Amino acid sequence: MKAISPVRSMSSCYQAVCCLSEQSLSIARGSSHKGPGVDEPMGLLYDMNGCYSKLKELVPGIPQGSKLSQVEILQHVIDYIFDLQIVLGEDQQQNSILNLQKSDFSELATQGDASVCH
């Protein structure tokens, strides 16, 4: 699975993240701040199904038209996170190599200036 995301509008991604954030906050707050009907098992199941639907929309590589189990959706999410970690690790490694090369160049330039001046 590649870590390349299909083109999505910024507003739809922002709305999805806000929706997930609100649901996460309501779960973290506990039962005293939950809305009506959320304490019931069916309400919780409905919320979880909504979360899985959002994951299917947001994670690239999940076939949109197919019926996947929750475990399959989570496996796609885990694979996508792993792919992102690899890409970020490669970017950090390239940045450190470039910074090292840049510092070597500046040291050489400084040494060259010193020999010309003295």
UniProtKB/Swiss-Prot annotation:
Single GO biological process annotation from the record: rhythmic process
Which InterPro entries does its entry note?
bHLH_dom, DNA-bd_prot-inh, HLH_DNA-bd_sf
Domain of life of the organism encoding this protein = Eukaryota
Per the record, the major location class is nucleus
The UniProt record lists the bHLH domain at 32-84
Protein localization: Nucleus
Q: Keyword set for this entry?
A: Biological rhythms, Developmental protein, Nucleus, Repressor, Transcription, Transcription regulation
UniProt name for this protein: DNA-binding protein inhibitor ID-3
One GO cellular component assignment for this chain's record is: cytoplasm
Specify the species.
Xenopus tropicalis
The answer to whether UniProt assigns keyword Protein biosynthesis to this entry is: no
Q: Which GO terms describe its molecular function?
A: bHLH transcription factor binding; protein dimerization activity
UniProt entry tagged with the keyword Ligase: no
Functional summary from the UniProt entry: Transcriptional regulator (lacking a basic DNA binding domain) which negatively regulates the basic helix-loop-helix (bHLH) transcription factors by forming heterodimers and inhibiting their DNA binding and transcriptional activity. Influences cell fate decisions in the embryo by sequestering and blocking the activity of the bHLH transcription factors that control these decisions. Inhibits the binding of myogenic bHLH-containing complexes to E-box DNA, thereby preventing activation of muscle-specific target genes. Also inhibits the activity of neurogenic factor neurod1/neuroD.
This protein's gene is called id3
| Quaternary state and interactors | Homodimer. Heterodimer with other HLH proteins. Interacts (via HLH domain) with the bHLH protein hes4/hairy2 (via Orange domain). Interacts with stat3.
